[in-house]
Amino acid sequence: MASTSDIRNGLCIKFNHDIYKIIEFLHVKPGKGPAFVRTKLRSLSNGKVLDNTFSAGHKIDEVRVETHTYQYLYAEGDQFHFMNIESFEQITLDKKILDNPGLLKEGTNVMVQVNTETDLPLSVDMPASIILEVTYAEPGVKGNTATNATKSATVETGASINVPLFINEGDKIKIDTASGSYMERVK
């Protein structure tokens, strides 16, 4: 059992008969009254986000997890296939456990958190950014660009991303995997 002082981003806890991953937390010490911790939890079974407040000193049930590096192989419907790069063991994960599956490119390394008690995968952490090639980009209309004008572009994985007007087919772009947004053009 851990206490609220042990809370950190990425910690997996058992709460309300489900396993949650802490996305955000904030220790609050008001002028009057006891301290507390505001948390944002994501359910690892269904992906829903829950806001919860723990009082200071509250005991939480920490879930022991191991992190392994897996390589993305291919997708088959809603099933995504990965291979452990150390043991070459293959696993199949459901689409709902992934944050942004449309950005996964074959050969991409991801970090898979596995519950040590049940050996079940809990979550998949993609790299912070990924470089993909633009396969289709709408033509950019010059003029009327007083603001940050964007257009829709399709990348090699089939995902649609909003990009600046100067991006053309064949360009490689860097994409933030957490938000799925354009970061920069790569030379």
Curated annotation (Swiss-Prot):
Spell out the protein name for this chain.
Answer: Elongation factor P
Record-linked HAMAP family? EF_P
Location in the cell reads:
Cytoplasm
Provide any one GO MF term from the record.
translation elongation factor activity
Its keywords, alphabetically, are:
Cytoplasm, Elongation factor, Protein biosynthesis
Pathway in which this enzyme or protein is active = Protein biosynthesis; polypeptide chain elongation
Pfam families reported for this sequence: EFP, EFP_N, Elong-fact-P_C
What organism is this sequence from? Flavobacterium psychrophilum (strain ATCC 49511 / DSM 21280 / CIP 103535 / JIP02/86)
